Amino acid sequence: GVDVIELGVQSFDEEVLRLSGRGHHADVVYQSAALIQDYGFTLGIQLMIGLPGDSLQKCVFSAEETVKIAPKIARLYPTVVLRDTALYEAYQAGSYTPLTEADAVERTKAMYEILDNAGIQIIRVGLKSSDIMAEETAFHPAFRQLVEGSIARDRLEAQLTELLASLPVTQASHMPLQESAVEVGIKFQAADRSVVFAANQKSYNNLFGHRGCNRIYFASKYPALTIRYLCDSSLPDGTYRVFSPSDDNA
């Protein structure tokens, strides 16, 4: 029997719904979601990024509203433009501009983190190549990896910055008080040339990013460091750890 019902909400913003011709108001979503949950079904919410009238702020709003109704699962889809559709006509007329790939990743990343932090399982990010005929669109066959790799980079760098800042000042007393990240990395080299980036098997590829973009980024920005990559099965999905091999707690 049916145990999961997903709502193709697309957006909680009234203007986006109107401009996209969705034919419903946001209040219908809240009512429908409550009924689905009251009858014991598992609720899923589908959201689209980059519809007419959309913005980063509206995407964040939609993700926050999704958290309020507490679905178990969610899907995030960047808008694609297909020929012989009203959206394609708007694109041809210049009244609709598709998101760039970079913008689509940034907006989706913001939504992903809101949902993920709330414990909502994100079962799909982007479309499969078999789902569409790619046209003028932000479609990328590895869109989920682009998003999750970007999230991984942010989380890794935040931990790396904290690790480097915790080093004894005496190791680089000749340096100015306000040091750049690279200068701090050079200071770190004097004590230990290596740091370790770790994730579990499922999230391991996100350490490197799509086509190794994260590896390239860190190697370029922190040339004084040797970064090793570790698969750690004790870490939860989407959790990344940065540490020094000499760390007693490693």
Label for each model-derived stretch:
Residues 86, 94-250:
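Auxiliary Fe-S-binding modules of radical SAM enzymes
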Residues 1-79, 83-103:
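Conserved non-cysteine loop/helix-boundary elements of the Radical SAM core domain that shape
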